[in-house]
Amino acid sequence: MTVANTETHSAAKPSSTIGPWKLGETLGFGSTGKVQLAQHERTGHRTAVKVISKSIFNNNGNHSNDDSVLPYNIEREIVIMKLLSHPNVLSLYDVWETNNNLYLILEYAEKGELFNLLVDHGPLPEREAINCFRQIIIGISYCHALGIVHRDLKPENLLLDSFYNIKIADFGMAALQTDADLLETSCGSPHYAAPEIVSGLPYEGFASDVWSCGVILFALLTGRLPFDEENGNVRDLLLKVQKGQFEMPNDTEISRDAQDLIGKILVVDPRQRIKIRDILSHPLLKKYQTIKDSKSIKDLPRENTYLYPLADSNNHTSASIDDSILQNLVVLWHGRHADDIVSKLKENGTNKEKILYALLYRFKLDSVRGSNKKNRNKIKKTKKNKRSSTLSSSSSLLLNNRSIQSTPRRRTSKRHSREFSSSRKRSSFLLSSNPTDSSPIPLRSSKRITHINVASANTQATPSGVPNPHKRNSKKRSSKRLSYMPNTKRSSLTSKSLSNFTNLIDDDDWEYIEKDAKRTSSNFATLIDEIFEPEKFELAKREKAELQRKVQEAKRQSVNAQKINEDEFGSEVSDGMKELKKINDKVSSPLINYEFSQQELLQDIDTLLTNRYQLSSYTRPISRLDPGLTPVTETLPNNLKEKTALLQDTEKKIIETIRRSKFLGSLLNVRGGLSPGKSELAPIEESPIVSTTPLIYNDRMEPRRISDVEVPHFTRKSKHFTTANNRRSVLSLYAKDSIKDLNEFLIKEDPDLPPQGSTDNESRSEDPEIAESITDSRNIQYDEDDSKDGDNVNNDNILSDFPQGVGISQEYDMKDKNPNQSPISKSAEPTLVVKLPSLSSFQGKNASGLGLYQREPSKVTLPSLTSNNSSVGENIEDGAEKGTESEKIAASLSDDDLKEDNDKKDNDTVNAPTTVKKPPNSVLLKKFSKGKILELEIHAKIPEKRLYEGLHKLLEGWKQYGLKNLVFNITNMIITGKLVNDSILFLRSTLFEIMVLPNGDGRSLIKFNKKTGSTKTLTKLATEIQIILQKEGVLDK
């Protein structure tokens, strides 16, 4: 193509528009350039623009003096792509070029590549896979019938439109196949290339395309490739392809028909390979074939169309050659003599002239068929205001395009610049050898086409009927209209001949050149204008289809959005119900017939009085004193407002009762030990709440509230509740001075008691409550003063702790174990004597304050407890202020350490303690001098490995009850974890470690270590584990 000088514009910034197309976002990159989304400025139609750099042409051996001239093979390739008009072949709409790039305006496939569909969804169902495969075979059959082979078929080059129809794209490797010549270029992808291409042998392109289709079918049905190497070794892959070595899927993966078709396609010998038309008649494709598919197959051109382009529908050879198509071939071959082309068309065998003739002839038939179908039921009316322009010129003007130079070029270019570039309409040409019997080729959009009357080649003079070439060549209104579609805008070239159009190409003042965009070449542009005309009707049809697609897409999105909203609403409701159920299950109190909120205490009292339910002793009451429960707040019913005065009074009494129960719960046995002469207290039986009458208090003898006495508190487990219950009671210690003077207080209470040194071991061992209370009080003082005066503390004076119990089912009653026991006494300075509160109001059978949580004493006998008699040291500093004692719980020691501690105490005491062996199934506790790590031990009679596995499963099942961060060290048999403070047991957060150690003779030992946190929490955990082991019968008796 001849290009005018545009150096002043070549360095400019690349334009965002090419002709009428406005370039947009980049869709992807290829080997020859990038692909951008484009939109028509007037119609809004979207296309894909493939940008090809001209530097590729120069690198491929194009050494023309004019760089803007495209190679002939590129021009032919573009014409072939345009002439391939099939629903399953990607359409080429237009071609534009600049100084540096070539722009191919292609059909836009919205759903992308078939490869991405397989990656996202995996193998397709057989019906969908066969529908896609059938469209691929039909499109390739169309190309093969016209002598075109693709040679690069793969899922990446198969695109999908908005309706998931196949569009075969990327004809960059395509070639014209003839019988005389075999192809030799090795091209394509290794996974899809045929064995003959991989081997480097001359091959027939039709058979190689069939092999690629077989690989694609395998991928559609299985989601993988038949020839592949996991390590990426291309050499091994090519060897597999050469041998045709692959694994056929079994019947469970694909059907027998699919196995048969794949076996017939993937044959190494191309001569034995199934033909493309035979695939369409295979039972697998016939299984899912529809009427529409049958029609598409029927509309395919003859299989040997490229061999006999001059044959008619009955394969009878026709000697006549269409002159208009012949002239187009002359234009395409850049002035090649027509006789030479005619001889090529009539000779035997195949050649490129026959293939191009067949393509143009097929294109012409499709255009005529489409035009006749649109105008079948229309009545043509004569329009007086419409004109018909015909151009007459001699064939000499066609053959010598630059022979007419009668007027200055400047004037001619200006006139045609206004007529062409300003309207941005492209010209249409149809070359005809006979002005009377030649007919225009109507394009698919039925745009108006002006045909040129070409006279005899021997006539050199201009006919008298031809006007001045620089004036408009229009006839009168009475001239007969030759366009097929009425009411279409005129878009024809108003020059006298092709010679004048060629001269305009060389003009520098063209507006196309000013906008840095031009057509490819003069002769090539002539052909492109004829077959690429973007007709108005075609664009309107596309706009209508696009609008319908958008409306359907909007409806589909609306339905999907509504469905998603409904699903989200349903999931939210379901999640809310599950969360509510979890909350209800987590609440330990029964929820039967609770009509109102559980937050307010008045509602609880009214419900208890109304229903009179026998509550289980294993449940915890719900009240405002319990911080772990926060139910939903609701308003009180109207009938309860009348009882406000009575309920307020009752509320105070209930609260005082609860406080007194916590204040006095652990002092019952202490009081019994201090008064050995009094009668035994009968055990309190489990009974429902039967009354809320005011309790009788002795104001002179008992403090009414805990806040009345400023004392430190030490929380421990009450003996009046079952071990399954988590209630705690508070033992009041009257200042740290009372710790020293407790023995003197006991002596004053009963002066006949013997001194501490004479206390018999049996009496001391039967009632551990007093010793435990004193020990706990002593521990509080020691823990607080440990950091300050640790050097002054004598560890020998600290009493040894006693076991807290053997299990949750073993309980202490409130009887005096021995009425004649001797209390501990100690000489000290006299201090103020404070009377402990009496329990007269709770000794009755129907007492309402504590009866709810009591149960009958367990029949399991308690093990005898070992105690050591030692004096309480007085060397603790008195500088600590009153009320600052903390609840730090001492660490524990093993049995051997306890004996060593007792031996050390023997040096300072008169009477050596008598040690009684503890039961092996009890939890052992000891206290270090300054340590803060608690150790508990449980003995079992099974091997340590079996015991560790049982603990592993047990603790895993307790994760939902507050056990977190469990770490299992199988090698060392160590389990570490944490009990969080928001657990269902409402215990303090504690970090613990459990070790399973061998104990000889197939026995084992569980050792609990408290790292940080609460001793009470660790003891609770050890006790619960001990109960489970006792039920399983694995405790060491």
UniProtKB/Swiss-Prot annotation:
It is an enzyme of class 2 (transferase). Residues 453-465, 861-873 have a biased composition (Polar residues). One of its GO terms (cellular component) is incipient cellular bud site. Residues 372-494, 746-804, 810-829, 861-918 are annotated as: Disordered. Residues 879-888 have a biased composition (Basic and acidic residues). The lineage of its organism: Eukaryota, Fungi, Dikarya, Ascomycota, Saccharomycotina. The modification Phosphoserine is found at residues 396, 675, 707, 777, 822, 825, 871. SMART domains: S_TKc. It catalyses: L-seryl-[protein] + ATP = O-phospho-L-seryl-[protein] + ADP + H(+); L-threonyl-[protein] + ATP = O-phospho-L-threonyl-[protein] + ADP + H(+). ATP binds at residues 27-35, 50. Involved in regulation of bud growth during cell cycle and in septin organization. Plays a role in cell wall synthesis. It comes from Saccharomyces cerevisiae (strain ATCC 204508 / S288c). Keywords: ATP-binding, Cell cycle, Cell division, Cell shape, Kinase, Nucleotide-binding, Phosphoprotein, Serine/threonine-protein kinase, Transferase. Its main location: other. It comes from the Eukaryota. SUPFAM superfamilies: Protein kinase-like (PK-like). Present with 538 molecules/cell in log phase SD medium. GO terms for biological process: budding cell bud growth; G2/M transition of mitotic cell cycle; mitotic morphogenesis checkpoint signaling; regulation of cell shape; septin ring assembly. Residues 388-404, 481-494 have a biased composition (Low complexity). This is Probable serine/threonine-protein kinase KCC4. The gene is KCC4. It is found in: Bud neck. Interacts with septin proteins, primarily with CDC11. Interacts with SWE1 and NAP1. Residues 21-285 form the Protein kinase domain. Residues 372-387, 408-427, 469-480 have a biased composition (Basic residues).
